[in-house]
Amino acid sequence: MIIVTGGAGLIGSNIIKALNDRGHTDILVVDNLKDGTKFANLADLNIADYMDKEDFLIAILADEDFGNVEAVFHEGACSSTTEWDGKYMMDNNYQYSKELLHWCLEHQVPFLYASSAATYGGRNADFIEERQYEQPLNVYGYSKMLFDHYVRDILPEAQSQVCGFRYFNVYGPREGHKGSMASVAFHLNTQLKNGENPKLFAGSDGFKRDFIYVEDVASVNLWFWENAVSGIFNCGTGRAESFQEVADAALKYHQSGDIEYIPFPDKLKGRYQEFTLADLTKLRAAGYDKPFKTVAEGVADYMAWLNRNA
């Protein structure tokens, strides 16, 4: 069996799809379906079982027998960068992850987990997987950084695979449940489909992010699992592309609309990463050599998927 926490979310459900494509269907999905709309991300996938995340944690703490577990992909977390309830964030993203990590180490189960580029904070260069480059801007980024530090301390003695991925700006199929936290590409498509002009923050040609297509993220996860590589790795494309380029790709697909520029919100000032760019030195040195989709390629693919599945 393979366990995927956050399996009904964007990255988790795409990992399940990639596993299905490789013939794996004995999959336990762990999630919180209080937001029932997330079921749609699993509707076309083949899984063996589902557990609520609270019930799963109780089972882990009680050391219940899950049989032969081949891997745990831990994608479940509160991923809202605008959530400021620190206790909730630390319980969800830090304590829960520690419990699951220790269960995996005890049972010699490969543990692959979601970290985040939010650990780097507001820097504009050197997004490198080392302590001196980490200074998060929000409690979400802090919770991810703290767990990475915990993992770093454990790695030298770990007898089974422990692998973290610092996801950069992930977008693609199965993110419709995320609301305001969905990608710019998702929101632009919705606006264009509704006959509206797509909206960007003023200055978006200068805001550059490392946008990575979610299928590429799933590919990275499965390659590292199959090759039993441990460590903490950036998961981005190694390119910084502007929000303007995302909008241009959406407009090209829809063949309509003009961009409207709206003022940058005061509440995000000083808490917003204006630039991200994954340093892929460690990822490539580990042996992952597949290319990553550009924004033009990924957004075109995503627009086709969104409008095919509307």
Swiss-Prot record:
Biological role: Catalyzes the interconversion between ADP-D-glycero-beta-D-manno-heptose and ADP-L-glycero-beta-D-manno-heptose via an epimerization at carbon 6 of the heptose.
Assembly, per entry: Homopentamer.
Active site: residue positions: 140, 178
Keywords tagged on the record: Carbohydrate metabolism, Isomerase, NADP
Keyword NADP among UniProt keywords: yes
A GO molecular-function annotation: NADP binding
Cofactor annotation remark: Binds 1 NADP(+) per subunit.
Gene: hldD
NADP found in the keyword field: yes
Pfam families with a match to the protein in the record: Epimerase (PF01370)
Record protein name field: ADP-L-glycero-D-manno-heptose-6-epimerase
Pathway as given in its UniProt record: Nucleotide-sugar biosynthesis; ADP-L-glycero-beta-D-manno-heptose biosynthesis; ADP-L-glycero-beta-D-manno-heptose from D-glycero-beta-D-manno-heptose 7-phosphate: step 4/4
Coiled coil: none
Residues bound to NADP(+): 10-11, 31-32, 38, 53, 75-79, 92, 144, 170, 178
